[in-house]
Amino acid sequence: GLGDVYKRQIADYPSNINLIVSDDGYGKNEYIETSRPIVIVTAPGPGSGKMATCLSQLYQEHKRGVNAGYAKYETFPIWNLPLKHPVNLAYEAATADLADVNMIDPFHLEAYGETTVNYNRDIEIFPVLETIFRSIFGECPYKSPTDMGVNMAGFAICDDEACREASYQEIIRRYFASACAVKKGIAMPAELRKQEMLMNSLHLDVSMRKTVPAARAKAAETGAPAAAIELPDGRLVTGKTSGLMGASCAALLNAIKLSAGIDDRVNLISPMVLAPIQHLKIEHLGNSNPRLHTDEVLIALSISAVTNPTAELAMEALASLRGSQVHSSVILSSVDEGMFKRLGMNVTFEPVYQSHTLYHK
């Protein structure tokens, strides 16, 4: 099985270099046994302790007579793209909650006379990192944060326009994510202001995401929540709220039909199948909303596929939805949002709740 080791908290980390690079600092951490010459250190996200783990291990290896090295593989920002290239700005949008800012690497500029892009956290920590390296090895092998990175992504770009367009779409998606996070009270308004600034700097508008005007128009037409889905080939469908199911379910079924070439008038799931599910939800499970969620509709579709060849065809078309774009005119439930993501669909929604209840799932 997998082993585990303890990492101790070090007082005044990372500023107290003398303490950090001592037996009372990194020396208190447990040594990680390895069997290969190259070890990859990965973690769930930023601030998880990847760099601290690597530096601690360097200290531990040095004590054992092994002069190990360290390099960082990080895709964004891309060091050899312009500071304000949309790809690099998309990285800022993705890390708006961390307040990351792309910057010209001053250490690289001074050392090599070359302009490269890095981000504030790496630039701010580099003097500390440099001192730690010198304390362990007597010298630092890197002259800049850019030196420390391993990143060839910029050389792999063969269609700059496609990368720019993908970046625009990512920034718009991140804008909606931040707007909804602020609405839910799990993010500060400053995060949304950062996204708005990035949108304005590139002259972006949310209508550039095709599903947004489509969902808004359907909601205005019906006076109820609506959703829109853009298939990978660019075709667009919408879904409206009904007594049987929510707009997300309707849009999902319509997308499946379109992808599978099934006539829009065909009912994939018999009302006789849906009615007992609604009865179960209301009468036995205590739900007040009889409309079905996406997971319930997909289960009903899979049951129908046993006896209905058209429903079976629809089930097989689910995989073709991966990479589709989804937008809802209201904040989706965690169930519906999670289901779209599990299907590999990129989902956004307006920062508006469907109801005015105090608690939202």
Q: For the regions a protein language model found, what residue spans apply to each?
A:
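C-terminal binding/interaction regions
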Residues: 199, 214, 274-361
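N-terminal leader/propeptide and maturation segments of large enzyme subunits in energy/redox metabolism
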Residues: 122-191
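Short, small-residue-biased leader/transition segments that mark boundaries at the very start
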Residues: 2-6
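Conserved nucleotide-sensing/catalytic segment adjacent to the nucleotide-binding pocket
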Residues: 80-127
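Glycine-rich phosphate-binding P-loop
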Residues: 38-62
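Conserved mixed alpha/beta catalytic, RNA-binding, or beta-rich assembly cores of soluble enzyme
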Residues: 38, 73, 78-84, 194-295, ...
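N-terminal pre-Walker A segment at the start of P-loop NTPase domains
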Residues: 7-28
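Phosphate-binding P-loop
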Residues: 30-36
